[in-house]
Design a protein with these regions (language model features):
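Terminal domain-start leader segments
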Residues: 1-209
Length: 209
């Protein structure tokens, strides 16, 4: 099943002139735990751990994960044709170095930029530019392969009771404003969903418990 999905992904890669495709474990907000709609790395690799990045080339594939998941990943990747890259271990290349080593000048690296944080994307770009590789950041190729992909959830938000939150929204905002004033800051921009949910005591059910 995994090998068939990888084969279909490679077909889409060739259609889009992409020689390497990166699939991180993330969503549009870089949430630590993602809903099933964003479980692209799990779908394409069969690896169910919470952390890992899959890279698919036209002739090989590899998955990077940390020490928490070495045994699990080795078991789940068996027979898939995906090599396990044990992060931090001797002789294991960095993801970008692996891509550079296996691609040639003017080849293209693709990924869905909506689920890649800016810091990582810029770091990749600096390495790929030196190797004269192109980047296409507007490709959700997994969506073309995952024909029964779950719908993007949109559950209603609700106010989390102060009884359980331990502090009211008004109190949190007051403390935040006092902190900003103390540090001579006019405003703050929050983009992390969990920070916003905590500050305003908001919750939803997009991600199952």
């Amino acid at each position: 099943m995994i090998t068939q999905r990888i084969s279909k992904l490679r077909e889409k890669m060739m259609e889009n002139n992409v020689q390497a495709y990166i699939i991180p474990t993330s969503d549009f907000h870089e949430t630590e735990y993602v809903c099933e709609y964003f479980a692209c790395r799990k779908y394409m690799s069969g690896f169910t751990g919470s952390a890992g990045v899959l890279v698919v080339l036209l002739d090989k594939a590899a998955l990077w994960t940390d020490g928490r998941y070495f045994i699990q990943a080795a078991n789940q990747l068996e027979g898939t044709g995906i090599d396990l890259m044990r992060m931090g271990q001797p002789g294991v290349p960095e993801l970008d170095a692996y891509i550079v080593e296996n691609l040639k000048e003017n080849d293209t690296v693709g990924f869905d930029g909506r689920v890649m944080n800016t810091k990582d994307a810029l770091a990749y770009k600096s390495v790929f530019d030196l190797a004269h590789l192109n980047m296409n950041v507007n490709l959700d190729l997994v969506n073309d392969v995952w024909t029964d992909r779950p719908e993007l959830p949109s559950t209603p938000t609700f106010h989390y009771s102060e009884k359980f939150a331990g502090e009211s929204m008004e109190s949190k905002l007051s403390r935040l404003r006092a902190f900003l004033k103390e540090n001579k800051v006019d405003s703050i921009v929050l983009t992390s969903v969990d920070q916003i949910a905590w500050l305003y005591n908001l919750r939803a059910h997009d991600i199952p418990n």
